[in-house]
A protein has these predicted regions:
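N-terminal intrinsically disordered/low-complexity leader segments
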Residues: 1-26, 220
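Helix-turn-helix
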Residues: 30, 34, 38-80
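Residues in soluble alpha-helical coiled-coils and helical-bundle/repeat scaffolds
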Residues: 68-72, 76, 97-101, 137-141, ...
Length: 220
């Protein structure tokens, strides 16, 4: 049986207190973390070199020693934030797989996870993921970095789904890689409705996603 606190565990996993991954150089790490913090309050195109230097206390020479320009730094910060999203997704699903003992419990857990990731509270996170992906499409430099993080997420989901399939918690008739991509697609796809003048009723959308989970992931 799923623990009573499983829903709150999901919320904690998707909080914003996850530590930033460290790079090999402390100054570079500090600059990236500073830029990542600024992205909490400002748009990509609003952040300047001066804002980063004022906040970090690091010299301009050090910044340009590690980064070609401000965009190089901000791309690194966006990748770090994306990596944090990857880590929280993996943690939440690992927690579910550890807790669920039956297919029905796995279904309930996926439904709860879906409600969190597609709720109003994650709207900004969805927008940021879309912005990061969009930036990577036009920046070969960033694309290489994002490919690694995206592959890490997909690979982790594939393995988690395979584990669930081996325990008969999840439909074993569908390719685990295809299921992993679908799981990501329905969450990120909500960004389309986030930008709508007349958004869909979220309960209706979640009911539809739950039906997909029931009929595709965990059929009775």
């Amino acid at each position: 049986m799923l623990s009573a606190g499983f829903h709150s565990e999901i919320w904690r996993a998707f909080g914003h207190n996850t530590a930033m991954p460290k790079t090999s150089h402390p100054t570079k790490s500090s600059l990236i973390e500073c830029a990542a913090d600024l992205l909490d309050k400002y748009r990509f195109d609003e952040i300047t070199v001066e804002m980063v230097l004022d906040r970090s206390g690091i010299s301009k020479g050090s910044l340009y020693h590690h980064f070609e320009d401000i965009y190089h730094l901000l791309e690194g910060a966006m990748i770090v934030r994306y990596a944090r999203y990857v880590d929280t997704n993996i943690t939440a699903l690992q927690s579910l797989l550890t807790t669920a003992k039956t297919g029905e419990e796995f279904y309930i857990g996926l439904s709860q996870l879906s409600a969190v990731t597609q709720g109003e509270g994650m709207k900004r996170a969805r927008q940021e993921r879309a912005l990061t992906i969009g930036r990577a499409i036009t920046s070969p430099r960033m694309s290489v970095l994002l490919q690694g993080e995206q592959q890490r997420l997909t690979d982790a989901l594939v393995q988690l789904i395979k584990d669930a399939q081996s325990r008969k918690l999840c439909n074993a008739e569908i390719d685990s890689h295809a299921l992993a991509v679908l799981m990501q697609a329905w969450t990120l796809g909500k960004i389309v409705d986030d930008l709508s003048e007349s958004p869909v009723d979220n309960d209706a959308y979640l009911a539809l996603v739950n039906r997909v989970i029931r009929e595709v992931f965990v059929p009775q």
